[in-house]
Amino acid sequence: ALTVDLSAGNDKGVVSFKKISDGEVKPEPTVVQTLYFDFGSSSATSPGKGDPTVNPDDNGNYWNNITNNNGNYANAGTVYGSLFNSENTPTAYALTLNSRFTINGASGGGGLLQPDKDLLDDLAVATATGDYFFMEKSEDNSSFTFSNLDKNKGYKFYAFGSRLATQV
């Protein structure tokens, strides 16, 4: 399950992949900007397990590449700052990994290598859907935090994930 907790009085949004939490329901926000994130491999450090998304993509959108920084892993505590929106306008937002993530995809297995634009619209970018972050069996919780959010504004988060596998 995916949960985003934007607690009142806090400028951070924690995205958790373990449990769903009840919280205050915010009014439907007006979308003023979109940010895209490609969680996956840096081809330089993990050849064959996917590639970062080249900007702009075929739809004219810009992506923030959140990639591994230690072999097949993205270390806990890593901060990805200087995030930009889909039009390549800089934002004040940052994303921090609260736990270690493992990368995989492409020839390493499991990613969606031929995304369907009719189903995924702007998310149908093979470099974004073909690799991914995941938790290993020994890990029971992984999360990341968005910071520098405005507590007086609403935020929508959409996540796409896939894995070609016969087991969970």
Model-identified regions with their sequence ranges:
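Extended extracellular/luminal ectodomain segments enriched in beta-structured repeat modules
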Residues: L149-F157
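Short tyrosine-centred short linear motifs in exposed loops/low-complexity segments
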Residues: A1-L2, K153
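Low-complexity, Gly/Ser/Thr/Pro- and Asn/Asp-enriched, turn/coil-prone segments
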Residues: T3-K137
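Short, flexible loop/turn elements at secondary-structure junctions
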Residues: S41-S43, D150, R163
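Short proline/glycine-enriched turn/loop motifs at strand-loop junctions of beta-rich domains
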Residues: N10, N152, R163-A165
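Short, surface-exposed beta-strand/strand-loop-strand elements in extracellular ectodomains
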Residues: F144-F146, G161-V168
